[in-house]
């Protein structure tokens, strides 16, 4: 199925690109989340009329994400978990825990925006974590996991 992208989609294209994707991907993800539209002649003509407005909205989202990223970049978040004597945690610190800790500091994030390349944190210490605020704005945050000896 051919679709017109209404915003930048990772590994697919940017605003205004007409791309071919599998029917299920378009029907179940891109179209319901308003990231794309079916590429019919009328939709293409309508898109060209609204193109400037959509580009302006995309630029505003990017500017807002960059402003939020400047505040968030280099921030250290402290999370306390129960741990054993050897420094290993009972349980782990997940992206949901980090998003919740950042929400406590006034940042509005979803857990999917917190990227943890090595998986959940299972030891006490400082760990680098990436936060994707926008497809073009990814900032680094340090998570300090503090052990609470039991």
Swiss-Prot record:
An example Gene Ontology biological process: translation
Family matches, as Pfam families: Ribosomal_L9_C (PF03948), Ribosomal_L9_N (PF01281)
Disulfide bond positions: none
GO CC terms: ribonucleoprotein complex; ribosome
GO molecular function list: rRNA binding; structural constituent of ribosome
Keyword entries, A-Z: Ribonucleoprotein, Ribosomal protein, RNA-binding, rRNA-binding
Keyword RNA-binding: yes
Record flagged with keyword Nucleotide-binding: no
Coiled-coil parts of chain: none
Chain's role: Binds to the 23S rRNA.
Family: Belongs to the bacterial ribosomal protein bL9 family.
Name recorded for this polypeptide: Large ribosomal subunit protein bL9
């Amino acid at each position: 199925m051919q679709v017109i992208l209404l915003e930048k989609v990772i590994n697919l294209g940017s605003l205004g690109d007409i791309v071919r994707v599998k029917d299920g991907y378009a029907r179940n993800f891109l179209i319901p989340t308003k990231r794309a539209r079916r590429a019919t002649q009328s939709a293409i003509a309508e898109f060209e009329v609204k193109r400037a407005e959509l580009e302006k909205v995309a630029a505003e989202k990017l500017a807002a994400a960059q402003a939020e990223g400047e505040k968030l970049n280099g921030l250290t978040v402290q999370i306390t978990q129960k741990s054993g004597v050897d420094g290993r945690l009972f349980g782990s610190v997940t992206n949901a825990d980090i998003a919740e800790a950042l929400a406590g500091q006034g940042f509005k994030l979803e857990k999917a925006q917190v990227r943890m390349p090595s998986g959940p944190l299972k030891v006490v210490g400082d760990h680098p974590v990436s936060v994707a605020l926008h497809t073009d704005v990814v900032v680094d945050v340090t998570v300090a996991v503090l052990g609470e000896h039991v």
